[in-house]
Amino acid sequence: MVSLSKIAECRLFLSELMPHKRIILFERLFKERLYIKQKSIMQTFKEVGEEWNQTLYTTLLKYLGSTHNGSAMEQLSRVATYAMIAKERSEQRTLEALLLGSAGLLELYPDDGYIKMLKLEFSHLAAKYQIKPMSAEAWQLQNIYPNTHPTLRLVQFAASMHREPISLGTAMACSTRKDVHNLFSGCASEYWLERFYLGRDKVEAASRIGSFTGDLIGINVIIPTLIANGLYMEDKTLISRAMVLAREIPSENNRYTKMWQSGNNPISISCVDSQALIQLSRTYCENNLCESCIIHRIDSIR
């Protein structure tokens, strides 16, 4: 249990800390958090046969699945693999058929002309790649935010992948926040925007992955993958580039950043800072590891 009085004491301390020391402290905490994330990515890397594009794809789909459908998205990435997606990306409709058919989601939609066309296309793809589709029961489709609905996320991803290949190479080329947003700027068709949420007549949803989610993909997928690859390849330049990108992405605004804010001067400017505060809260404060916390070793920072 977090001691609120202790949090208040440390919050005041951080707000009064010399800016250069706070920057160093937050970078250390940020790197601790990155280490945890890159360990998870390296585990995925081993599970998928040490293939970096598949690793990025699996990590991305799992993140797009959010809390409710992350596991199902991860499973889908192994049914419709990156190699299949990359080979079929010339047609957006083909990618929709491959992803939604493999997910078992196509079967849920009424058989109008477009769905029949996608089902026919998927039958050819399933035979070509020997795909065994998932069950639709693997997915949570009700009582979720429309913008996190798996059908919408998959057709948004299909549109982005059709527009430009989402690969380790294109991720490595991201040096700014705008580069990350551009990577996911493909637009889902009006057809899906009007029909993706079964059981609802009209649902407000974005045609493409927005800047808010784009930032979170940068924080939780792109940057950790670049760090993992940089460590694996012993490429310090790539690690430095990932850190520069992290400084480009603004701070998250969540309960952790709010908890540590003191006064009117924000202490969390970039995602380096907000991720550092998450690491501080989850690893040290919530486990009462005050003696192990870097704040107690602040005098060692120069």
Predicted regions and their residues:
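Sequence-pattern detector for short linear motifs
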Residues: 14, 24-25, 36, 244
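Terminal, positively biased "leader/anchor" segments
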Residues: 19, 23-26, 30
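Acidic, carboxylate-rich catalytic segments that either coordinate divalent cations
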Residues: 263-302
